[in-house]
Curated annotation (Swiss-Prot):
Belongs to the universal ribosomal protein uS11 family. This is Small ribosomal subunit protein uS11. Part of the 30S ribosomal subunit. Interacts with proteins S7 and S18. Binds to IF-3. Located on the platform of the 30S subunit, it bridges several disparate RNA helices of the 16S rRNA. Forms part of the Shine-Dalgarno cleft in the 70S ribosome. One of its GO terms (molecular function) is rRNA binding. GO terms for biological process: translation. PROSITE patterns: RIBOSOMAL_S11. Keywords: Ribonucleoprotein, Ribosomal protein, RNA-binding, rRNA-binding. It holds the Pfam family Ribosomal_S11. InterPro entries: Ribosomal_uS11, Ribosomal_uS11_bac-type, Ribosomal_uS11_CS, Ribosomal_uS11_sf. GO terms for cellular component: ribonucleoprotein complex; ribosome. NCBIfam families: PRK05309.1, uS11_bact. Transmembrane segments: none annotated.
């Protein structure tokens, strides 16, 4: 007997005017998540998701592409204004922020929420190349 096909439910279009963009930029990758005011993720993207592999994921261009992708997905839900929270020491911080502005968002606030240790864990040893 033939198996009945399951229908894939189409993503419903939410009407959200403002939200928060979390830009997490590490030394190896850049991840952008756009959420509503309650913290529910609307769209997300990363440099790895955009097809970059290895050391190319950590470039500012990869972060720009990821931010544009996440921004376009969020704009489909009607989002127009953003608060941006930047976290991490990576190279894609500024380029991701500029890319979000170029997509068409009005950025109201920019917050740096990078955790700073008060002499916490021992850092990794220096690289000898």
């Amino acid at each position: 007997m033939a198996k009945e096909k399951t229908r894939v439910k189409r993503k419903e279009r939410k009407n959200i005017s403002s939200g928060v963009a979390h830009v997490n930029s590490t030394f190896n990758n850049t991840m952008i998540t756009i959420a509503d005011a309650q913290g529910n993720a609307i769209s997300w993207s990363s440099a790895g998701l955009m097809g970059f592999k290895g050391s190319r994921k950590s470039t500012p261009f990869a972060a720009q592409m990821a931010a544009e992708d996440a921004g376009k997905k969020a704009m489909e839900h009607g989002m127009r204004t953003l608060e941006v929270e930047v976290c991490g020491p990576g190279s894609g911080r500024e380029s991701a922020l500029r890319a979000l502005q170029s997509v068409g968002f009005t950025v109201t606030t920019i917050r740096d929420v990078t955790p700073i240790p008060h002499n916490g864990c021992r850092p990794p040893k220096r690289r000898r190349v």
